[in-house]
Amino acid sequence: MQIKTEEISQIIESQIQNYEQRVEMSETGTVLYVGDGIARVYGVRNAMAMELLEFPGGLMGMVLNLEEDNVGVALLGPDTDIKEGDPVKRTGKIFSVPVGDAVMGRVLNPLGQPIDGEGPVDSKEFRPVELKAPGIIARKSVHEPMPTGIKAIDAMTPIGRGQRELVIGDRQTGKTAVCIDAILAQKNTDIHCFYVAIGQKRSTVALVADTLKKHGAMEYTTIISATASEPAPLQFIAAYAGCAMAEYYRDSGKHALIVYDDLSKQATAYRQMSLLLRRPPGREAFPGDVFYLHSRLLERAAKVNDSLGAGSLTALPIIETQAGDVSAYIPTNVISITDGQVYLEPNLFNAGIRPAINVGLSVSRVGGAAQIKAMKQVAGTMRLDLAQYRELAAFAQFGSDLDKATQAKLNRGARLVELLKQPQYQPMPFNEQVASMYAATRGFMDDVPVASIRKFEAEYIEFLRDAKGDILKDLDEKKAIDNDIEGRMKAALEEFKKGFTA
């Protein structure tokens, strides 16, 4: 056997040249205290706010408090296996979530991990959950409509792309249903939807996912779920995680809609964390920065200017009130941050007016500029008619001898209230809304019995679809009522009324 010394020396030389001395440096600390989803860690001197720390067993924690000799960490999972003295490692990463089309149609937890049993999320891009909102120069005023398919909202409190419209009301008044309808209405649009469930029951989230699937809306929707059984830090961070995923579309020149259900529970989770981290309590035991908690989240919803891609992110935050008290701490905070609110009332809900929207207390501060012209033309007088109706209805209880004008207003108002009722999960296209409201506001329904208004509307829309499809098509294309369309609509109504039996 001949030993080739040259060959051996070449191999040794190449090995020496390719040798890399790698030393993995990691800053570690020690758990001083753990309990209630909070850990105090000593030794990680260079930790950053919102940085992820790794605990034994792969559990992650997020740095929230930076103190003189230790850091307060919110644990993003169960703390049962962590004990005092355990080693903790810095990751050097700020909390980020996967973004892009890979998350569409999925049900995720706030860490971006799938919980729908459909395999991993194959995303190449990640985005930090906490990002600065666009500045003043980067924004453009809200001017494009975002129809929700709900007549009462599209007519009187219209929502534009890039707006923040609060949905507020007591428990069981249909707040989630209104927002789910808004998601269903985006079916044939270019809007990507996100539903963030914070502190909800698991059965509720399963029902929402099932409803979206049944109506074919899940393909353009992502659900981020932090249910009531999850630790408070996950409930707190869920809204920001959902917002980061939705912002990806805003910054790519596309459009997104995000529903936060609900921010009252997020504030409660944040209060729990803050008190456990020994931050000083303020009003209603909330920490001093609870306003900033919501403002920095909702300011990220914006209409971006053309030079940045003209994308938009529309937010529908939900707030649950206690016994109709909209002047409590969290409701007033969020009302002052948002661009208007849709107020749902239990009295209306129990009276069978559903969606139970109180059109007197509901406002849209910027949506008017985004409202479709045709809708403006038919719904312009509607708010006034309904306000007069409510005022007169209160007086009419005391006296029976009313003059003709008052009776006419009461009759018209009763029919408008009936017209604004709508079944759940049946959003209405805007051209059909315009057609039915035109009939009501121009007096074509004044002689129809109140009990038959819904029947009149359904049959009239069916008649238009079958026999007068060109009217609906022209409304859809022109987005306004000109003399030609108005003449054809009047003729169609007169023709339909001849054959209609209440």
Curated annotation (Swiss-Prot):
The places in or outside the cell where this protein is found are: Cell inner membrane
**Which residues are ATP-binding?**
G169, D170, R171, Q172, T173, G174, K175, T176
Example of a GO MF term: ATP binding
Among PROSITE patterns, the record links this protein to: ATPASE_ALPHA_BETA
User: What are the entry keywords?
Assistant: ATP synthesis, ATP-binding, Cell inner membrane, Cell membrane, CF(1), Hydrogen ion transport, Ion transport, Membrane, Nucleotide-binding, Translocase, Transport
Show the InterPro entries listed in the entry.
ATP_synth_asu-like_sf, ATP_synth_asu_C, ATP_synth_asu_C_sf, ATP_synth_F1_a_nt-bd_dom, ATP_synth_F1_asu, ATPase_a/bsu_AS, ATPase_F1/V1/A1_a/bsu_N, ATPase_F1/V1/A1_a/bsu_N_sf
| GO cellular component terms, semicolon-separated | plasma membrane; proton-transporting ATP synthase complex
Family matches, as SUPFAM superfamilies: C-terminal domain of alpha and beta subunits of F1 ATP synthase, N-terminal domain of alpha and beta subunits of F1 ATP synthase, P-loop containing nucleoside triphosphate hydrolases
Organism superkingdom: Bacteria
Q: Which reaction does it catalyse?
A: ATP + H2O + 4 H(+)(in) = ADP + phosphate + 5 H(+)(out)
Q: How does it sit in the membrane?
A: Peripheral membrane protein
Q: What is its EC number?
A: 7.1.2.2
Q: Where is this site: Required for activity?
A: S362
HAMAP family, alphabetized: ATP_synth_alpha_bact
- Similarity remark: Belongs to the ATPase alpha/beta chains family.
Kindly state the subunit structure of this protein: F-type ATPases have 2 components, CF(1) - the catalytic core - and CF(0) - the membrane proton channel. CF(1) has five subunits: alpha(3), beta(3), gamma(1), delta(1), epsilon(1). CF(0) has three main subunits: a(1), b(2) and c(9-12). The alpha and beta chains form an alternating ring which encloses part of the gamma chain. CF(1) is attached to CF(0) by a central stalk formed by the gamma and epsilon chains, while a peripheral stalk is formed by the delta and b chains.
Biological function: Produces ATP from ADP in the presence of a proton gradient across the membrane. The alpha chain is a regulatory subunit.
Name of the protein this chain belongs to: ATP synthase subunit alpha
- Lineage of source species: Bacteria, Pseudomonadati, Thermodesulfobacteriota, Desulfovibrionia, Desulfovibrionales
The record's gene field reads: atpA
